[in-house]
Each structure stands twice: as structure tokens, then as C-alpha cells.
Design a protein with these regions (language model features):
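Redox-cofactor binding/interface segments in oxidoreductases and associated redox assembly factors
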Residues: 34-35, 75, 163-164
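Active-site acidic short loop of glycosyltransferases
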Residues: 29-30, 53, 70, 158
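A Rossmann-like FAD-binding core segment of flavoenzymes
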Residues: 1-21, 26-29, 91-183
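Glycine-rich dinucleotide-binding loop and its adjacent helix/turn
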Residues: 38-80, 84-92, 182
């Protein structure tokens, strides 16, 4: 049986298991497959939700890359996912700015990806820099970022931002039923 509703609790102290659906029914089950996905880590930016899918993305696929042909884009993040996204988007975008809050990539990204970023003239690494504001009407049109070393802000006509800052698993409702680590 497939139920396209939100499970809110799993009672696993005896068999059959019981899955609570929203504030409503409880469904007994001999087996439960849990595919909860993750919640993207999102910076506390005004207008972020307004531009999701209209210039703000949490993944870089072929589809998004086609929207960025010949444009300047931003990839936010310092991990391997951000590095892979930057290298991938640099194939179609005119310029890819990689913004990281830290002083570099060495602690969070593989040496191989760092080398590919450094060798790609279409990729510009901006360390100790983060987005301060997103602006536009129905679609993202401008991004203001702040360099924390100098304190200077810069506004750029950029229509596509890729937040590659990780995610947190949607497993909070499984306490006591599955073993989880801190990640």
C-alpha cells in the first residue's frame, strides 16, 4: 500500500508497526520503507522563498544549466557538491561565482575539485563572502553579497543562485525507532 500523505510518527515498540498519518488515522504495517529525503539548509535571507524555482535552486541539473547559458551565476557552498555544481555550470554559464563563508576550500572539498575550480577561467572563488540580499520582481534579478574581510557589499545582476549548502535528513519523527548519527 502506498500512502501519499505525511507520516508524523512511527510506533516501533511492537509488531505490527503503527504509522501515524497526520493527525488522523493509524496504519498497521509488517514492514515500513522510509524514504524521507532531506530538508535543504537555507540561509536566513528575506525573499528566499519567493525566488525558489525562480532563480534560487538547491540542485544543479541539466535542466537548470540550460537556464543559465551565457549568464553569470552564483554557487553558494564550500563542499564537494558545490564544487561539482560549479564545474558543471561552468560548461554553459559565462561566469560562476563560488561564494564561501570560510577562508578557503581545503578543509571541505576534495583536492581534485579544488584544482578543477582553480584551473577553470569561468569560475571565480570568493572566500569569506556571503549573500546579503536577493532582489527582483517575479524572478531573481540581482544579488547583493558582502565580503567579510573588507566589509564591502557588491550588487550584481545575477538571475540564478545555487545553494549547495547541504541538507538535514527528515528523520526527526523517527526518534526511538532508528539509530541516527549527528549528521
Amino acid at each position: 500500500v502506498i500512502i501519499a500523505q505525511t507520516a508524523t510518527r512511527l510506533a516501533c515498540d511492537r509488531r505490527p508497526y503503527t504509522v501515524e498519518i497526520g493527525n488522523g488515522p493509524r496504519v498497521p504495517a509488517r514492514s515500513v520503507i522510509i524514504a524521507t529525503g532531506a530538508e535543504y539548509r537555507k540561509p536566513p535571507l528575506e525573499n528566499l522563498a519567493r525566488f525558489e524555482g525562480a532563480g534560487v535552486y538547491y540542485g544543479a541539473t541539466f535542466m537548470e544549466a540550460q537556464l543559465c547559458v551565457g549568464e553569470e551565476v552564483i554557487v553558494v557552498g564550500g563542499g564537494n557538491s558545490a564544487g561539482q555544481a560549479a564545474v558543471f555550470l561552468a560548461q554553459t554559464a559565462r561566469r560562476v561565482y563560488v561564494l564561501v563563508r570560510s577562508g578557503g576550500l581545503a578543509e571541505s572539498m576534495s583536492r581534485y575539485l579544488i584544482r578543477r575550480i582553480e584551473e577553470n577561467p569561468a569560475i571565480v572563488l570568493r572566500t569569506q563572502t556571503e549573500i546579503a540580499a536577493l532582489e527582483g520582481d517575479n524572478h531573481l534579478q540581482r544579488v547583493r553579497w558582502r565580503d567579510h574581510r573588507s566589509g564591502n557589499s557588491e550588487v550584481n545582476d545575477i538571475r540564478h543562485v545555487f545553494f549547495m549548502t547541504g541538507g538535514d535528513p527528515n528523520t526527526h519523527w523517527l526518534d526511538g525507532c532508528v539509530v541516527r548519527d549527528t549528521k
